[in-house]
Regions:
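Large, well-folded core regions of big proteins
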Residues: 40-44
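Extreme N-terminal leader/anchor segments
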Residues: 1-37
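CBM-like, beta-strand-rich accessory domains located in the C-terminal region of large
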Residues: 94, 140, 328-485
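Short acidic-hydrophobic surface loop/beta-edge motif
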Residues: 29, 278-282, 310-312, 426, ...
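Carbohydrate-active enzyme catalytic cores, enriched for enzymes
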Residues: 179, 183-321, 325, 372-377
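Aromatic-lined, polymer-binding surfaces characteristic
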Residues: 47-222
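Residues that flank catalytic or metal-binding motifs in active/ligand-binding sites
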Residues: 55, 146, 276, 306-308, ...
Length: 485
């Protein structure tokens, strides 16, 4: 093997973020809220994403993982690798490579030279395979993760050729994927946090090996991503669950802040612009609204047909919520969770505002034009429905959140506005002009009918909670106001 890792200088990094508890002795794993005993690295009985999580080996970095336990699993992985089809996919290689390097760094004083040599031989071979299988067919976060892994591995192995290639790819992908307002172009707050974590890892590795030019470049994007995170998070430091986002996967905002501070970074909030999201706030109300186009135009796999969707919190507690995501399996549930009716916006003729299909595919997309944008009000329109334009105005004043919808055009098809409540919201009374709940009231003008339907929301994978959804049928114009009871 052509690499150089001096025994005394395995990659030292400032303390990284510990991973979620997934492994339980002797061989039980919990991923995506699904528990299973280890059978093989290729076990897809819980779905492909579960098998991928097993092969990422994030769990080597969970707080209670001992060196002895982790070593046994690394050895087992190396032994089983010739028959491990899933583990040799490029995305698991990328994530696992970083985790192995962190694990070795954490326990470098305990790793015997013969064992380290065996681990390094396997790790280097895996990274060279990744180098040949970069995910240009998927692009997006997958290719960026590939670049992260090769960059960190190139520093660990002191491999200049790999470093030059990884640095070039990393710069190209960061320049393309991180928008000027600091957001990741796939518009998922969850993936933003995941990618920020490993970008911090890259910066961490770089500063500890004195790569000054690359350090400055990485710092630029890290600070930008931190600035966006400060702008989009709720007051309680949780993320909005927009597009493909769920809790229990990415590092928390507080963990990311603490990691950045350990790296002596400083940042300030950046105004949201290119991401398409906006924040409207008053004393008791906090709303995040979506008035953006699909920014990852060639890779919208994590995007939903959610134009003009919003989430609303009252006194930091969820009131109107996105229905979230519970699965990546190509099922009817996955199709619904990406559909327009699963979001707090309008359908015309029971159609989606953008075409979603195949679990991660998107066809024709709505095109958005922002008409006005101020601190307390934003108005935009989109052309996602055939024969008409949907205009929506969001306004927040004196703890009243107002939504005005207008359908412009010759299309007289039935329009439906959906409002999805958080699971703990109870509908106390309903009429043609008012909806009363245990936390707030909604006054409605322009409705032909209002109906309560039973629904589910998901804040974590494979966990559906019963909830109520309001379905408002209208013709051309609808206004509703949300205010505290």
């Amino acid at each position: 093997m052509e690499y150089n890792v001096p025994r005394q200088s395995s990659l030292r990094m400032v303390s990284v973020i510990a991973k979620w508890y997934c492994y339980n002795v002797p061989k039980t794993f919990t991923f995506l809220n699904l528990i299973g005993d280890f059978k093989s690295w290729n076990d897809v009985s819980h779905g492909m994403l579960w098998a991928y999580n097993l092969n990422y080996m994030d769990w080597l970095l969970q707080p209670d993982m001992t060196f002895e336990q982790g070593s046994e699993w690394v050895e087992r992985f190396i032994t089983d690798l010739p028959t491990n089809r899933i583990g040799l996919d490029p995305y698991p290689i990328a994530l696992r490579s970083i985790n192995w390097i962190k694990f070795i760094g954490r326990h470098h004083k305990k790793v015997e030279s013969n064992r380290l040599q065996r681990w390094n031989d396997s790790l280097y071979a895996q990274c060279k395979l990744l180098e040949r299988k970069l995910e240009y067919q998927l692009l997006g976060n997958h290719l960026l993760e590939d670049a992260y892994a090769l960059f960190i591995a190139s520093i660990y192995f002191s491999d200049k050729k790999m470093y030059d290639k990884a640095s070039c790819l990393l710069y190209k992908e960061l320049d393309e994927q991180i928008l000027p307002d600091g957001s990741h172009y796939e518009q998922s707050p969850m993936y933003h946090c995941i990618l920020l974590d490993r970008l911090l890892d890259c910066y961490n590795a770089s500063i500890n090996r004195g790569h000054e030019k690359m350090c400055e470049l990485l710092k630029l994007y890290v600070v930008r991503m931190l600035g966006h995170l400060e702008s989009i998070v709720w007051k309680d430091d949780t993320i909005p669950l927009l597009n493909d986002s769920a809790y229990g996967i990415a590092p928390t905002v507080s963990e990311l802040r603490a990691y950045a501070k350990r790296l002596k970074l400083e940042w300030t909030p950046l105004p949201m612009k290119e991401c398409g999201y906006r924040k409207l706030c008053s004393t008791h109300l906090e709303a995040v609204v979506d008035v953006g186009n699909i920014t990852a135009t060639y890779q919208p796999g994590h995007s939903h047909a959610d134009t003009f969707n919003y989430e609303l919190r009252i006194d930091c507690r969820p009131f109107v919520v996105d229905t979230g995501i519970s699965t990546y399996n190509k099922t009817a549930r996955r199709q619904y969770e990406r559909s327009t009716s699963a979001h707090n916006t309008v359908t015309v003729g029971n159609k989606d505002s953008s075409e979603v299909w195949g679990g991660f595919r998107m066809g024709k997309r709505a095109k958005v034009r922002v008409l006005s944008d101020t601190e307390n009000e934003i108005m935009a329109e989109h052309d996602g429905f055939k024969g008409c334009i949907h205009q929506r105005k969001f306004t927040i004043n004196d703890d009243v959140f107002t939504i005005n919808d207008k359908i412009v055009g010759n299309n007289m098809t039935e329009c439906i506005s959906y409002i999805h409540f958080a699971p703990d919201i109870e509908v106390l009374a309903i009429s043609s002009t008012e909806i009363r709940t245990n936390r707030a009231n909604i006054s409605v003008s322009g409705a032909n009918s209002i109906e309560i339907i039973n629904d589910f929301v998901s804040v974590e994978y494979n966990r559906l909670e019963p909830s109520k959804t309001i379905k408002i049928v209208f013709c051309r114009n609808l206004t509703y106001q949300i205010f505290q009871a």
